[in-house]
Amino acid sequence: MLTLDTLNTMLAVSEEGMVEEMILALLASPQLVIFFEKFPRLKNAVTADLPRWREALRSRLKDAHVPPELMEEVMCYQQSQLLSTPQFIVQLPQILALLHRLHSPYAAQAKQLTESNSTFTPALHTLFLQRWRLSLVVQATTLNQQLLEEEREQLLSDVQERMTLSGQLEPTLAENDNAAGRLWDMSAGQLKRGDYQLIVKYGEFLAAQPELMQLAEQLGRSREAKSVPKKDAPMETFRTLVREPATVPEQVDGIQQSDDILRLLPPELATLGITELEYEFYRRLVEKQLLTYRLHGEAWREKVTERPVVHQDVDEQPRGPFIVCVDTSGSMGGFNEQCAKAFCLALMRVALADNRRCFIMLFSTDVVRYELSGPEGIEQAIRFLSQRFRGGTDIASCFRAIIERMQGREWFDADAVVISDFIAQRLPDDVVSKVGELQRLHQHRFHAVAMSAHGKPGIMRIFDHIWRFDTGMRSRLLRRWRR
């Protein structure tokens, strides 16, 4: 079976130009122009996808098969090229019959060339083959364009669906260009409008709770790079020029304000002997506002001091993945559930912006896992947001799942985040011991996001940092009032 790629090679038809024209026409379509104006961050993400589009189009052209009629005509043309003029004249009736049977666009022109010339010369033989080849090139080009047009319609349909999805989720999940690119990659999945509206809903809830978003950003970016003074830093010599009054008597050329007691004017010195003005004298002395004689000329000297070298080493703090455990017990239902889900969505936003992983585990009696930053992150986020918090509380299982996950090499610098009201039983000693070991030896950090002011101190004591977001009615009213 003859492929279109082989036919293009045989007839020297360049598909590259046609592919580029199709890509340019796609980018110039009104739908994309309006989308790029509305969401400029996603423009770079879509543009970065162009090489993949080109490769997909080339692959489609390469794998496409030529229709049997065109393939038969091409094979006949190739065989005819090998014939001499006398041999071609002998085969001409069969060639004309073949072109007529295949309904070739060249059939009528070939018949006209033959009938209008009584003598079939070598020049006519060459002209016949040239026009035949030109007809085949036109047919091959038309076939390429038809396939590209079909692909363009399909590609435009897919891009429009992804643009709709990405445009809806961009305000919630795309903080920067990196996040926009990852969001565009995730949008390649098969999603319906009703599915991702759940993310939009929680995004709107998150926007209405700016303190929750701020808390997520503080937690997510709490491991910033910091400068650490170099230990045992050597001393370095530091030289400065200091201006001082001349120490030898010189010609007086005026009065100035200073703290030079040796050059005090008599009226200033007299105030020192008056009890009521003594403190005023000392104040002016400290502020260098006493009236003194100004000598002609000033003396400069070089002051030499030593101080530690101020160079610092930058201790870049690793920023690894998030392992987020969410309490799905009955006490976490209602507003707590909304806040916990919205907080995870905010952490997903931070993870996409900083190119980090975000792994969610739900704990009640069983542990359910979701990865929100993978290629199927949007589907995973929708499944997570669809969960209902109606189970029991088994925080020990949560910590054991975190500990198990942190044993893997790809999670060696992960941060653990536990979202709960921490109204639960105490942790077993072996779990507390293992968490402490991970904190000491591997610098893993454990964060608690407390949704209640009544969490048990015995449980929360093991965390490196406790982020409080009280969901009680009083705190909610206070936050609303402050806005």
From Swiss-Prot:
Pfam families: VWA_CoxE. Coiled coil: none annotated. Keywords: Chaperone, Cytoplasm. InterPro entries: Uncharacterised_CoxE (IPR008912), Uncharacterised_ViaA (IPR023481), VWF_A (IPR002035), vWFA_dom_sf (IPR036465). SMART domains: VWA. It is found in: Cytoplasm. GO terms for cellular component: cytosol. Homodimer. Interacts with RavA. Belongs to the ViaA family. PANTHER family: PROTEIN VIAA. Component of the RavA-ViaA chaperone complex, which may act on the membrane to optimize the function of some of the respiratory chains. ViaA stimulates the ATPase activity of RavA. This is Regulatory protein ViaA. It comes from Salmonella schwarzengrund (strain CVM19633). The lineage of its organism: Bacteria, Pseudomonadati, Pseudomonadota, Gammaproteobacteria, Enterobacterales. The gene is viaA.
